């Protein structure tokens, strides 16, 4: 790897490797070359439209305020927007394919036609998957229209094996075509109305089943209300049959579907099925949940039959119609922070508006570029030596895909680095101030996007089939003027109240794009931008890697010797923005005069605790705040969001159920939770060391009069507590907790001194705090038992697990103490999973995907 590339990424070898292995083409050795390659292609489309726009001038006064005064984009200005991954980052296939001679699609995701209810239909869908995968991209299919098991068929079998029986066929096709560098990813969805839904819910409990696909259930409001009310629910096939046409009192439940227009119905208890959904989600991380009515009510495309979504892409952020596709781009939010990590830090809202306006314009250009690349695919198919009979299905697929692409002109404009943006502004991720700033950013973003897509409709024409009366309700007429009354779904209703100027212009002139924004996974993108990923909080700002020491090396620091006698050196890998923060601060006041490479784990822990990421990492965030943040993001996002709520392994089924219910009520379109360890059967466990079978009692070492102590502030059951941990040799020895009433809520270090029996004081910065007062008997028992366990040598990891097994909810006292103690689990013990590619245990789960922080492997790209 060349030195210049390493220097470009500020010595971040992971970023350099990801770019070189995934995106460099045609001998490229530097990202500037890739950015120039892409800018040239975008500019080609831009110049074409500018010629048309400049021929007439009567459109100027119709444009938005910014649209009237902006300068035309050039190849140079487009390049500057891409350069250094600072503002706009085209995702995945766009970076690797645009401007090359590869015969591939620029789209990141597709939804295929649902399989027809016949073997021929199923076979055709299988073929469609193959043809999409071979040109890159993930695909979603909905199998709700395949008949239930044991229903009548007009063949020698006489009865169907059911919709679920074909899932492995589609999954195996995905795994097959994903080999040798070709990229396959699959989402299979099923309507909760389907009589086979229980088999669908349970199928991935068998870890050998459907291993090549994500699965999700389409949940409607009627089912969710039946769960809430512990009521009955009617499964039916066809799934879109209306209950109201059934004379339910006069029909025999479970009557077989005859294939003649009759309906197969089945009466169930909704809560029983919901409990099975929660069990699978908690223990196996699937199925995901799609809140289908929420999606339809908040999707601008859903009021149009020809664009109404039928399924989502594999990561769940793009709901699409059959043969529809989307091309993704992400905007780096960190770049809008002026004076990051200082008291003067603030957002440049003017620049946010401009960049999102221009980004959407580039996204529209990308639609035309995709049409060109599909033409190349079509010409390649036509020139292939196979007979027309063999080629016809693939040819038809790409012709329909091009037509759908140009008709709706979908754009998938997203964001990344939200977590780092908040840290740079000195906000905790889930603070009230953070929620307010997120809302302000999203409103500015939406205003820019609306202005752009309406301006583009004026300049270039609206999407095919636009009809203002499908979208808005108005009173009055053109002669006397009209008043915007509201929208025909919740999305247009929101526009008519929150963006009144844009709504009226959209009613008059239309818009260019049927749908235009999303929040997609940005695993590889965030490695290149060197920021937090998507809208997720940072997982951790540092982690430790071990490097094996060559026996011939001399004078090398040895940090660890394993059971085989091999010597290892530990070194820190710093999150790039954490490193930027350290460079902007005088870290010597906390860890002394040290170079970054000399920082040990204790140094990093000390710095982390005074950084803006402290108590704002993925495992620190209260799940209700995560849902509230996602709801704000969703309100101002036209499609959906890929995001994951991380939960401890001891979370209860009831808590998982509450999280999903809360998300549905908050208006989310889809939701994913990841319970720590729930995919341990899928990923490879590294915990293979034999356990000592002997049992011994162990006496506690004598307590010194004085211990090093750390005080943390936490909330349990609505009360604020100070939790003080006493340590010997940096290992926890005892735990105290009591009510905290002071204003200053910052953690601090000091000394715990035993004054006399049952009287301990905490001395910090000249202040004395009592540590054994104001606790209930239950709270005192918890801390005493925790202290006794630590003093007698219990592994802190198992103590945390036991505290988390209490029946209380996530905010109970025992679990609040566990959250503090978890910070003391030694590096390397927190994760028992390892990456299938590089073997690292630095595996996290975010944005719906497992990701390796060591090599960059991500299921979502």
For every predicted segment, state its role.
Residues 1-794, 798-806, 844-846, 857:
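Extended catalytic cores of very large enzyme megasubunits
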Residues 807-823:
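Domain-level detector for trafficking modules
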Residues 823-832, 841-846:
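Short, flexible, mixed-charge glycine/proline-rich loop motifs
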Residues 833-836, 850:
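Cys/His-enriched microdomains
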Residues 836-840, 854:
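Short, cysteine/histidine-rich loop/knuckle motifs that typically chelate Zn2+
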Residues 846-852:
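Short cysteine/histidine-rich zinc-coordinating motifs and their immediately flanking basic loops
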Residues 859-861:
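Short metal-binding segments enriched for Cys and/or His
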